[in-house]
Amino acid sequence: MYWLARAVLQPLFHIYFRLSRVGREHIPTEGPVIFAANHRSFLDPFVMGTLLRRPMYYVAKRELFQRRWLAWLLNALGAFPVDRGRSDQEMLATARAILERGDALLVFPEGTRVRPGPVGSPRRGVGRLALETGAPVVPVAVFGTEAVRKGWRIRPHKVRIRCGPPLCFPRVENPSPELAGAVTHRIWPCVMLQWEWLGGEPPPRRDPIPARPPGVRRGAPARKQAA
C-alpha cells in the first residue's frame, strides 16, 4: 500500500505544489533514523514521505482514522493512531519499537501545528528517543504547506523541504530529563537553521546587553547605590 500511495502522491505534489527537496544527500539510506521537523499543516507528513524510498512512520490522532479513505491513506503512509489522552510513555514505547526494528520515524518536536510566524518551542521527547535508540537525527524544515489550505480548499502553492546533516548522540539507557532536554536543545537550532534558510521567520532574538536603568542616558554612568 505504501508504494501505491507514494506513486500517486509524489507526482501530484511535484505538479500541484512545485515541491522542492534540498539536502536529500544527508538522509541515511538504511537503518533507523529520526526526522525532526517543524509542523505547520496536516500535509506535512505527506510531503515528508516523499523524501524516502521506504516507509516513514509518524503519530496521527485517532480521530483522523474515522474516515475510511483517509484511514487507508494514513495507514499506507506509515501513520499509527494514538488517543489524545494516551500517555507520552506509550507513544515513546511505540516510537522506540519502530526505530529498534530499523525503520524511519518522523517526529514533530513542537507537539502540535504552529502557525503563523516563527517555529515553536520543542518538547524533549525527540532528545530522549535519540539517546535511548542511538538513531541519527536529521533536522528538517517544511516551508509553504501552511499556505496550501484555505478553508476546505486545497490551492497550488510552492512547498519546500530542506534537510540538514544528521546529528548523532551516544546511546544512553534511561536518560535523565535534563539530558534529554539538553539533546533536544542541540537538535532544535538545527531545525530552525533549515527553516531560516528557506525564508522562514526567525525566532525573537534576546538582547544580550542588559537594559539601562530608568533615567540613565546612553553613555552616562549609572548612579551608585546609596549605602
Predicted regions and their residues:
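Onset of an N-terminal alpha helix
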Residues: 1-9, 184
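Non-catalytic C-terminal accessory region of glycerolipid acyltransferases
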Residues: 90-227
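A short, well-structured juxtamembrane/interface segment
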Residues: 11-31, 168-169
